[in-house]
């Protein structure tokens, strides 16, 4: 079951929250359709901004939209001109007052949706699919991910018969509900047809209440230091001392440290 279902829906209420937060009775179907139109318009017109997720909140006639983007400057524009244009277009689309909250994704290398979109853009630019997957895999692991799984499906490399290929590194426990697994999907439009890209990223186990989970998420983002990278100890080394040189060199260094230095007499004394 965990292998087939969407990881976000499978863990809804356990480690993930709803991306749309409002309540309605008679207007439920109308508001759901309105949310779909908002998301489609944003994904179509702000594709270059690298949208990770869109969250929508409603209060009476006011709609609050949270945009998580890898490049928020594209959404904001010069002196906020682009953000005002987007807000105006959405108000025309919905006929309601719109409030935009634009947030930056601190570590795009460990965001599954952005990783999938990056691979798809490389495939559309005729980059070899294996090279694109390996590069994304290494970047995610170097940025602090505990495990990653990437799968590409379609006419890979322009082959006549479609197939699926994937790479995996680390742990990706899809059946564990407490596991914080991010999932993303994007389609690459190539001359041979569309290629689907799926990405699963494991960031660790999550426990406690929603408030505690939010605090843990903020702590992980602060520990990654923005965009992550290979600073500090390399992955897999931890705090272990450098073992290069072998046991003999270590024993010789220890013996020389324990041997007292010879005392020399002053010739002029």
From Swiss-Prot:
Disulfide bonds: none annotated. InterPro entries: KH_dom, KH_dom-like_a/b, KH_dom_type_2, KH_sf_prok-type, Ribosomal_S3_C_sf, Ribosomal_uS3_bac-typ, Ribosomal_uS3_C, Ribosomal_uS3_CS. One of its GO terms (molecular function) is rRNA binding. It comes from the Bacteria. Coiled coil: none annotated. Residues 236-252 have a biased composition (Basic and acidic residues). Residues 38-106 form the KH type-2 domain. The keyword Iron-sulfur does not apply. SMART domains: KH. Part of the 30S ribosomal subunit. Forms a tight complex with proteins S10 and S14. Binds the lower part of the 30S subunit head. Binds mRNA in the 70S ribosome, positioning it for translation. Belongs to the universal ribosomal protein uS3 family. This is Small ribosomal subunit protein uS3.
């Amino acid at each position: 079951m965990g292998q087939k279902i969407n990881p976000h829906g499978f863990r809804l209420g356990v480690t993930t929250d709803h991306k749309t937060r409002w309540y309605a009775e008679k207007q439920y179907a109308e508001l759901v359709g309105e949310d779909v139109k908002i998301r489609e318009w944003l994904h179509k017109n702000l594709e270059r901004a690298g949208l990770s997720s869109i969250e929508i909140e409603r209060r009476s006639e006011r709609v609050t939209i949270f945009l998580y983007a890898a490049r928020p400057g594209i959404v904001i524009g010069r002196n906020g001109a682009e953000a005002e244009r987007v807000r105006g277009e959405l108000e025309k689309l919905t006929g309601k007052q719109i409030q935009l909250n634009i947030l930056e994704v601190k570590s795009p290398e460990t965001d599954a949706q952005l990783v999938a979109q990056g691979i798809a853009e490389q495939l559309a630019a005729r980059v070899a699919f294996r090279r694109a997957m390996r590069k994304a895999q290494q970047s995610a692991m170097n940025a602090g991910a505990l495990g990653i799984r990437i799968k590409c499906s379609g006419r890979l490399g322009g082959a006549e018969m479609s197939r699926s290929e994937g790479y995996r590194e680390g742990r990706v426990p899809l059946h564990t509900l407490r596991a914080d697994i991010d999932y993303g999907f994007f389609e690459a439009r190539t001359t041979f047809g569309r290629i689907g890209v799926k990405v699963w990223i494991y960031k660790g186990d999550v426990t406690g209440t929603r408030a505690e989970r939010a605090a843990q998420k903020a702590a992980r983002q602060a520990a990654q230091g923005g965009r992550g990278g290979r600073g500090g100890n390399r992955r897999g080394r931890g705090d272990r001392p450098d073992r290069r040189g072998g046991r003999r060199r270590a024993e010789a260094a220890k013996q020389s440290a324990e041997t007292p230095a010879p005392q020399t007499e002053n010739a002029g004394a």
